[in-house]
């Protein structure tokens, strides 16, 4: 529940592992055709890199589905509080939610790398797994960590604010939750798009 330390329970970790494995295998299938003449490890490396780039969106969605109802409910109880009280509550929740989001990233990437080695029988050794880990771009990893933390904080603010707004306008809990989820997804996707277009050198045309 909101207000209690969020633990990495088995269900949340399990969903993260499943998401990482599924994403990696999906990207490998997409890349295997166009890059069929490239060495297998190149395909796996690209798949893991792509998974790392998409990981913040997936982790944010998992946390939103898990914590959204409780956070919207918490927001409804802040309707008569001053804006400063809402900010204090956001800070308190951010201390537990943002580290949780960041902590899920290694699980997702580990599952992606393991599934990548299992897609090809010849890539099932520990050496190949270490190779995939070693070829994960530090820049992509840092960006994934930053975006995961940023998206988690943004979703936290949206859910609390929507709960507060719903209580003020006398909206139902389901309507508030639906709006919070829709707005959170739209904001995160939009921010990710702006990030890629403006800050990614490979897209914006800037130097590396």
Regions found by a protein language model. Name each.
Residues 4-8, 33-68:
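Membrane-embedded or membrane-proximal helical elements that form or frame transporter/channel pores
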Residues 11-33, 184-198:
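Hydrophobic alpha-helical transmembrane segments of multi-pass membrane transport/permease proteins
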Residues 22-23, 112-113, 151-156, 160, ...:
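Hydrophobic core segments of alpha-helical transmembrane domains in multi-pass membrane transport
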Residues 30-52, 110-149, 158-179, 202-208:
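Membrane-interfacial helix-loop-helix connectors in multipass membrane proteins
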Residues 62, 66-67, 141-153:
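Selective recognition of hydrophobic, aromatic-rich stretches within alpha-helical transmembrane segments
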Residues 71-91, 173:
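Short cytoplasmic-facing helical segments at TM-TM junctions of multi-pass membrane proteins
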């Amino acid at each position: 529940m909101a207000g209690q330390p969020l633990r990495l329970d088995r269900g949340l970790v399990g969903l993260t592992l499943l998401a990482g494995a599924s994403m990696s295998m999906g990207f490998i299938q997409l890349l295997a055709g166009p890059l069929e003449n490239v060495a297998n490890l190149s395909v796996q490396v690209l798949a893991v890199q792509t998974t790392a780039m998409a990981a913040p969106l997936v982790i944010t969605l998992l946390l939103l589905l898990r914590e959204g109802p409780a956070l919207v409910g918490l927001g409804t109880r802040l309707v008569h509080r001053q804006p400063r009280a809402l900010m204090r509550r956001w800070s308190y929740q951010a201390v537990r939610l943002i580290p949780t989001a960041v902590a899920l990233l290694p699980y997702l990437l580990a599952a992606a790398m393991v599934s990548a080695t299992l897609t090809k029988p010849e890539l099932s050794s520990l050496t190949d797994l270490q190779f995939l880990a070693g070829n994960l771009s530090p820049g992509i990893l840092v960006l994934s960590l930053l975006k995961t933390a940023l998206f988690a904080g943004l979703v936290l603010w949206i859910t609390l604010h929507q709960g507060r707004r719903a209580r003020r306008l006398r909206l139902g809990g389901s309507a508030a939750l639906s709006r919070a989820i829709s707005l959170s997804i739209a904001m995160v996707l939009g921010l990710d798009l702006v990030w890629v277009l403006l800050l990614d050198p490979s897209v914006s045309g800037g130097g590396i």
